[in-house]
């Protein structure tokens, strides 16, 4: 088994690092790329239908020389993939890339620095490094270097295997660290931690360069290559370093990208996220005023604090598996691990690999014209409380629209367009007059003679995910049937389950991110007609469901023109079953009866309705499937995307006690104080299950409790960015019109400086 862990271009060479039969290797490969040019006699065909012929380059630099020779015109007309790393990987691994997660060295790191003058700036790296802790998944040992005393016998982390090296000074500490990091045994393939990309790694690189010179700092790269990057996030420019040969997968970034099942957070500090995910905290040092006091007065606890941070990262990965997920996605796309944190790069590689294996050449890449186009349809809700609400959801709306209408850049019919929009479609005033094409709701036609590249990949991914999920379920059943005392077999099965889970989750995430890539004007396959076609067709499809639902409900309930659809949100409809329940359902049987009506009448009606839509647009293949989601005895809407449902049954799962589904309400917003969120959730249960008197009593009780809480417990969690935009050095501290939370941050910084407290408290940036 051979696979890569990092591939980079250096001049005319490809620096290739990976594993072969369980052993790490590093190789420097001379690589000559292949690109293509238009040629009416060419033997190859590009995705856009052009005939092309290959241009074989001896080295990568020749491509740029050719572009300069033709003054940039040649670059625009050159077909093929100019991402040479991806091209190299496609040639090296044209098929599915298998990998062994267990041999890949994933190293977690955390550093501590002197903070007697306040929080240190990584770009300046003026303060000494006081402790470094590293732990890899290969030997499971926590390696720690520091100049203070620490005893293994006195640690509170006795369950961990710690190797502590006491150093005489910072120089020795950093020399030992570099020796460990750069050794063939311990050099990482992946380095992770919490905010390591913008703090730990740049601080180490800058500090080592300051003390020993840049050549020593470059030893952090197995190739001796480190490149500085300037990255602007939230209006603030930050320094990062690309360590050639080693992937940086900052767990903070991974959590923000893939940890969406936990929802938005009031804070993204490690202490808070560890509490949310693991119900654990960082090691508390509340008995000391700050980290510097802890370092000076309790060295034992200071090192324990350092080790604990690394352990928390390790435990987050054990539970969430986000690094394994990123690796799985990277090998699926044939890209470097860090490319999974974006959207367009991985999809560009996925499509390139698929087309290359079919002998189709990718078109040139370049910025396209992009005008504004409509998004998903959100219906203004019927505000207030509703009895017996049932929700229905279209399965993967946008990917399935792409498949049903065969939408892809190469299937767009050039020069053909009709006056079509969602309103015309819903009135059924216009039928597709070109049966050889599929008509989208923006009036664009798509060819049907063969499946487009985007629909093909979506279908392939869906089919593969279905197979993987079946394997995962089979393994879960195998685990249930296996003797629990057979630990070796249980571990094997759990590893299989984890692998399948990551595979299916990687496919799901990629499918969900495809539309985002298609709407990006820098994406090779961006086409405004396709992007607009997807969203306007999506609006039509969900409003078509609304029309069909209202026709059905008015007929069954013997009403006229009553709107039974309370709300619509892109791919979901929320239907008021209150009249139907009053008219036909026996008390006490509501949930079971609604479930039966949905299964036997509602869903078949929607299936027939979507078959009519399919015929009207002359689609490529039917893919619209609506499923029943929640049955709730009460629902409350306050505005678009803001509601509460008291759910009794969800997707066929019957709850012993109803569960609240809350969307957009302050009770789940990370900007609402935690104490208020908990109180609101409790209050909602009273609202849906009690009466006015009970609600007023609950509010009065909390109001009394609220007045006893500290300012920290009731203040609004708010993030700020680009605060320098509002700052004023003269004529006051902040500009007129400064938002209140930014004003607070500027006032805080002003008083910290005025009182000389920078050493104790970090400024808000």
What are the language-model segments listed below?
Residues 1-187, 308, 312-331, 338-375, ...:
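DnaQ-like (DEDDh/DEDDy) 3′-5′ exonuclease domain used for proofreading
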Residues 458-479, 507:
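Non-transmembrane amphipathic alpha-helical segments
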Residues 289-409, 415-416, 487-553, 567, ...:
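Common nucleic-acid-contacting/processivity interface regions adjacent to the catalytic cores
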Residues 109, 249-250, 384-397, 465-468:
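Conserved catalytic palm subdomain of right-hand nucleotidyl-transferase polymerases, strongest
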Residues 177-203:
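Proline-aspartate-enriched helix->loop->beta-strand connector
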